[in-house]
Amino acid sequence: MSRQDIVAEIPRLRRYARALTGEAVRADDLVQDTLERALGKWSLWGSGNLRAWLFSIMHNLYVNQARSPRLVDYPGDEALPDLPARATQNDALELRDFAHSLSRLPEEQREVVLLVALEDLSYGDTAKVLGVPVGTVMSRLSRGRERLRVLLEGSEPDEPQLKVVK
């Protein structure tokens, strides 16, 4: 593996970081921290899937940052475009709805959906990145896809349905 192999992964890292953080500036900082950590620990990486290793580093950094209080405020991030849109207004609305629905997923489901569906990682690699068993990846993916379907169809009830149990 070479530095060029790492550089080739930057677009995927940026996309995943943006989906995790929801903010372009924080995403770029997360990617930079990930690359800095990867280059500093280069000697620890053996053979294997470079993408999964980089995503593992990013995931761990993100979790650590989420646990600690945010000290830096990023003003002006709201002026940045959310996602690139295709030409038609209808497509832009569908993309916006999808991004909104994706953001409403629980974090555990959103991470798995992004890594498997968007970043094309295998279940095994996704499990390594997140530090969970493969079965957990599969169940989170199934629940996440179902929840996305419900959200996108708009069939989710406004109020939770309660069942009377006797």
List PLM regions with ranges:
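A short pre-motif secondary-structure segment
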Residues: V112-V116
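Residues within helix-turn-helix
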Residues: V25, G124, G135
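Short hydrophobic short-linear motifs embedded
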Residues: D158-K166
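DNA-recognition helix of helix-turn-helix
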Residues: L130-G154
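Acidic, proline/glycine-rich intrinsically disordered inter-domain spacer in sigma factors
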Residues: S68-P69, E78-S103
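Σ70-family region 2.3-2.4 aromatic/basic alpha-helix that recognizes the −10 promoter
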Residues: Q32-L39, G48-S68, L141, R145
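Arg/Lys-rich amphipathic alpha helix in sigma70-family domain 2
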Residues: S56-G76, D91, V150
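A short, charge-rich alpha-helical start-of-domain segment used by transcription regulators
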Residues: M1-R15, V25-D28
